[in-house]
């Protein structure tokens, strides 16, 4: 029973700390941070011709003169199902259909010909999941909701040429400025109907990291991009409530707290101008998830159910995560003036490896390797104002959880539709 209880709390905390994942069951990447970039599936680290470069590679800001503003939102419509528990049952349970709107905003201003500053505000977390009240995974999650907002001020500069061609550098701060999480689940180890564990929490303090990048263009038709996003140490605190559970094992409620260092990431990108109106890019993204090997949680009050040789006072527990490093390969193309003046078309493909090992897989984040496909377009209404649109389809590989110690044991299937719409303004 102790292990089950801890999985409930730990799974909730993992949602808010899974820095490359969104909060619904399959754990989607945060790369859906710009409508225009969505059209190329986030293959944008060497693109450097749009204000959302703040997120993908801040060095690209130095290409932008004057005032640039872009805003938009992506509608994330995940669909997930679980079949099991195996081998006893082959019954299918479907996650409730939910849709989530995740906004983004970017602005930049050219201070001089070679120096540009900007800021981005985006919400890579703003999702949730809701499973049936009675299903094999109700000890891990019935309903979860999450929202986290980031701000990312940045500055970029174009260096004087010195033999490598055009070289641009940029850096910014990534700051988690607010966040909240909720989770509810059951503890079936007790023969009490309608028992419920509820958790609500917030980011304790703003979490600060940085991103930095460089762009090198040895010739006009070729740009190489390299960018780094630092790890971020995040502090989280909240309250856990225990309803209809024995007082001898659980207090009525207690505060909880933890901190975790989110993993760093690196991107190497190549952008090639094939024709005057045709550009292609390939990005290789690596996440250092191996830093997330365990999660320690502290409790303000003694929880008798947690008393053990490892936690004699019942106020601390450590969970094994043992995540692996993971990579993404993203490719995108852009074709302008496609038969209509002012129309630009985009497309993309991506493969996204998941970091979660089989033995620590759970129903909050039953992450799986994913294939992604995208199409997008921009239309210049005027020379200074464009409408951006994109659509992404994500198909996750079927994930078998029968080796998981967290349960439930069965098979997960997940897909998602992500349409997005926004605008870009240049002054």
Question: Where do the PLM segments sit?
Answer:
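Cleavable N-terminal signal peptides
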Residues: 11-12, 23
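N-terminal, post-signal-peptide region of Sec/Tat-exported proteins
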Residues: 50-76
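Positively charged n-region of N-terminal signal peptides that target proteins for export
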Residues: 1-9
């Amino acid at each position: 029973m102790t292990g089950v209880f801890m999985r409930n709390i730990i799974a909730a905390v993992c949602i808010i700390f899974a820095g490359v994942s969104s909060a619904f069951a399959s754990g989607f990447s945060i790369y859906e941070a710009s409508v225009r970039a969505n059209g190329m599936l986030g293959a944008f680290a060497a693109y450097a011709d749009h204000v959302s470069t703040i997120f993908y590679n801040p060095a690209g800001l130095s290409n932008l003169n004057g005032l640039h503003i872009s805003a938009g939102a992506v509608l994330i419509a995940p669909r997930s199902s679980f079949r099991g528990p195996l081998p006893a049952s082959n019954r299918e349970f479907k996650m409730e259909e939910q849709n989530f709107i995740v906004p983004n905003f970017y602005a930049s201003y050219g201070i001089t010909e070679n120096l540009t500053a900007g800021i981005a505000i985006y919400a890579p977390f703003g999702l949730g999941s809701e499973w049936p009240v009675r299903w094999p995974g109700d000890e891990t999650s019935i309903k979860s909701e999450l929202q986290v907002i980031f701000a990312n001020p940045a500055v970029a500069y174009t260096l004087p040429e010195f033999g490598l061609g055009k070289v641009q550098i940029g850096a910014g701060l990534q700051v988690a400025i607010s966040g909240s999480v909720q989770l509810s689940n059951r503890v079936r180890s007790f023969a009490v109907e309608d028992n419920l564990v509820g958790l609500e929490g917030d980011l304790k303090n703003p979490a600060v990291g940085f991103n930095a990048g460089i762009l090198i263009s040895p010739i006009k038709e070729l740009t190489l991009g390299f960018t780094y996003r630092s790890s971020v140490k995040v502090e989280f605190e909240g309250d856990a409530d225990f309803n209809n559970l024995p007082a001898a094992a659980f207090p009525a409620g207690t505060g909880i707290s933890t901190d975790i260092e989110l993993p760093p990431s690196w991107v190497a990108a190549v952008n090639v101008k094939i024709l005057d109106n045709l550009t292609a890019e390939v990005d290789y993204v690596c996440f250092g998830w191996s830093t997330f090997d365990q999660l320690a949680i502290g409790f303000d009050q003694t929880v008798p159910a947690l008393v053990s040789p490892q936690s004699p006072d019942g106020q601390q527990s450590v969970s094994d995560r043992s995540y692996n490093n993971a990579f993404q390969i993203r490719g995108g193309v852009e074709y302008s003036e496609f038969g209509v003046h002012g129309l630009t078309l985009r497309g993309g493909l991506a493969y996204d490896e998941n970091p979660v090992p089989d033995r620590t897989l759970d129903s909050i984040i039953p992450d799986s390797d994913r294939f992604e496909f995208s199409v997008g377009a921009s239309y210049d209404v005027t020379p200074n104002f464009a409408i951006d649109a994109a659509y992404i389809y994500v198909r996750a590989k079927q994930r078998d959880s029968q080796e998981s110690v967290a349960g439930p044991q069965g098979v997960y299937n997940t897909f998602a539709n992500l349409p997005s719409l926004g605008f870009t303004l240049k002054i």
